[in-house]
Amino acid sequence: MSKKVKETSILTQRSKPEKIVFGIIFALFLIYAVSLIFPFVWMAVLSLEEAKSLNTAMKLNGAFYIPEVLYFSNYIDAFTTMEDNGVNFIGMLMNSAWFVGIGLLFTMFWHSITAYIFAKYKFKGRNFIYTCAIFSMIVPIIGSSGAMYRLMAELNLYDSGPLYLMVTSCGGFGGTFLMMYGIFANISWSYAEAVFIDGGSDNTVFFRIMLPQALPAIAAMAVNTGIGLWNNYGTALMYMPSTPTVASGLYKISLYISDHGRPIYYAGLIISIIPVLIIYGFMSGSMMKNLSIGGLKG
């Protein structure tokens, strides 16, 4: 019988000073990771405290403690008692669902088309438009929000719900545009030349050749974009006050909620992050794999 060759890890191949440096870096990243996770764990613990006794318990036991009795009913109360502008918590979840769905669909579609055109086609004014697009992303939102608010009011898009979202998601520029631009720029144009020789059109090149190759990376970016839309409270707060999402609704509730209602509010926060954790948990592995682009075989 052949002996099984013992595999050596990367750590065992390092010198002693390298192992020390590696251990220090690992410890620092571990501390950083714990510092990010701990607030959510603490919030989950406080969400199980009795609403009326939270302040008293914190004064007696300190800020960090585990309740003697766990009140899981706080999560039911989050659905039944919390509301904003006449919309209950379930309604806010539904608003967030279509907010993410519509915003993600229109954003990814138009950004992919715009990025592909700027990456693969040369036309007059291309550099000027590209520069203006980059400049618009540099300008702080506080500097453009006033003009944007007035424009939406003049176009009767203010507080129009899905209509506002469909129109504003068709801009074609943004952080996603820059990433897609790099993806399409790295796909060989030889694919398109082969299609043109066979009589294919520009639409055929994009929808049948380029987009399928970029789709894995686009899907990975869609996850991050979707999470950003789910957590986006500013847009709904400023331009869609009648249709509060989970993010904007919980933000407004936090401004006037009493101390007795804090555990129920924390329960609502925990519920709001569950969809994000589920999606990211299932997609995190494929996100890293799908950020590579295939190439031509020689």
Locate the predicted segments by residue:
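N-terminal Lys/Arg-rich, disordered targeting/topogenic segments
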Residues: 1-9
